[in-house]
UniProtKB/Swiss-Prot annotation:
Its main location: membrane. Keywords: Cell membrane, Membrane, Transmembrane, Transmembrane helix. It comes from the Bacteria. One of its GO terms (cellular component) is plasma membrane. InterPro entries: DUF445, UCP032178. The chain crosses the membrane at residues 1-21, 357-377. Belongs to the UPF0754 family. The keyword Transmembrane applies. It is found in: Cell membrane. This is UPF0754 membrane protein BcerKBAB4_0766. It is a multi-pass membrane protein. Signal peptide: none annotated.
Length: 378
């Protein structure tokens, strides 16, 4: 009976010692969190292994992540994976479609993103571009004559229109002279003419008798304007003036109209501020609807594919610039010892328990063997 009791005691003590030893060893990985001193003497094994080597652990974790986990090769394979690309394209299409079908106005979107100043900047930049283009256009065309500046088609249209213009002027002149207003104007012109000549009017009056001078002159003027020769004469005059104009410099226009007046007139006609305001008052959906299918169906897949291709080609430099090892090191260094302990235990809790149980099993086995040895030695 004593023999079996001795074996039970040695086995139990061995199991307790083995299990507790392993449990203590595991605890000493993390505890104590800080060094313990007796006077000036630091107690051995304080602090625990992980608190003591936390900085080195942070460095090694950073290297492990960069060298073995987030490697350029691994990320490159992921980026070139067809399933991943298809999934990313579909996700991007859904998200982009949500944005371009938004019922909010562009102005509301800009306010939401704190970009209210964009409207003012857009107006300023558009007006600046238009102004620069006008100045460049005028600077170039001011070096030309009208013949060089105007397109050949304009020359043809003007020259073909001259006879019609001459005919139009004469017809309008005849129509005006036949009216009462025209007759009154002609009469006044005749009176003014003879008033400056004194006795000449009396001499003409003797020849005409009681007939009004305007009644004699009006039909003759109308007859003159209606003759073919008059039309040819006016056509020739207009043609000569047109030829003179073609030889003159466009720059002469500046003496009549200043550049700034031209610029302001064009800007006023374009109404940049009103146009931009009207554009921003539209909803995102209204603006994007005409190109929605193109954006979602073509632009997004193409952009994602090109982006992934660029990312694959530059993944090494991207990871280098991100300095992942340093990021991991800094993050781990900021962990408190308690948090680091909880993190490790949450991952290895079951395994560490098994190590404790294994220590108890080995200790119990050794105690049992010791009991057998004592039995045989007796």
């Amino acid at each position: 009976m004593n023999i079996w009791l001795n074996m039970l005691i040695t086995t139990g003590l061995g199991a307790i010692i083995g299990g507790y030893t392993n449990h203590l060893a595991i605890k000493m990985l993390f505890r104590p969190h800080r060094p313990i001193y007796i006077g000036k003497f630091q107690v051995p094994f304080t602090p625990g292994l992980i608190p003591k080597r936390r900085d080195e652990l942070a460095v090694q974790l950073g290297k492990m992540v960069v060298d073995h986990l987030l490697t350029p090769e691994g990320i490159g394979k992921k980026l070139t994976n067809k399933e991943f690309q298809t999934s990313l394209i579909r996700w991007t299409q859904v998200e982009v479609d949500k944005v371009i079908t938004n019922e909010q106005s562009l102005r509301d979107m800009l306010e939401k993103w704190n970009l209210e100043h964009v409207e003012e900047e857009a107006i300023g930049k558009i007006e600046h571009v238009i102004t620069e283009k006008i100045h460049a256009f005028l600077a170039e065309y001011y070096t030309y004559t009208w013949e060089q500046a105007l397109p050949h088609s304009v020359h043809e249209k003007v020259e073909n229109a001259i006879p019609n213009v001459a005919s139009f002027i004469l017809k309008r002149g005849i129509s005006f002279l036949e009216s009462e207003e025209g007759k009154e104007r002609l009469s006044k012109m005749i009176d003014d003419f003879f008033a400056s000549r004194g006795t000449l009017l009396n001499l003409v009056g003797m020849f005409l008798g009681n007939v009004s001078l305007v009644d004699r002159v009006q039909p003759e003027v109308i007859k003159f304007l209606g003759q073919d020769g008059t039309e040819r004469l006016l056509t020739d005059v207009l043609q000569k003036e047109w030829e003179k104009l073609k030889g003159r410099d466009v720059k002469e226009l500046e003496t009549f109209v200043e550049k700034e007046m031209i610029v302001n007139s064009i800007l006023s006609a374009v109404k940049v501020e009103e146009t931009v305001s009207r554009f921003l008052n539209q909803s995102v959906q209204q603006v994007c609807e005409p190109v929605r299918e193109t954006i979602v169906g073509k632009v997004v897949p193409s952009a994602v594919e090109k982006g992934l291709k660029w990312g694959t080609e530059n993944v090494g430099s991207i990871l280098g610039n991100l300095q992942l090892a340093e990021i991991v090191q800094q993050e781990v260094s900021t962990f408190s010892t308690e948090r680091l302990e909880d993190l490790v235990l949450s991952i290895t809790k079951n395994e560490l328990k098994m190590i404790t149980y294994l220590g108890a099993l080995l200790g119990g086995t050794i105690g049992f063997i010791q009991g057998l040895l004592l039995l045989f030695l007796k």
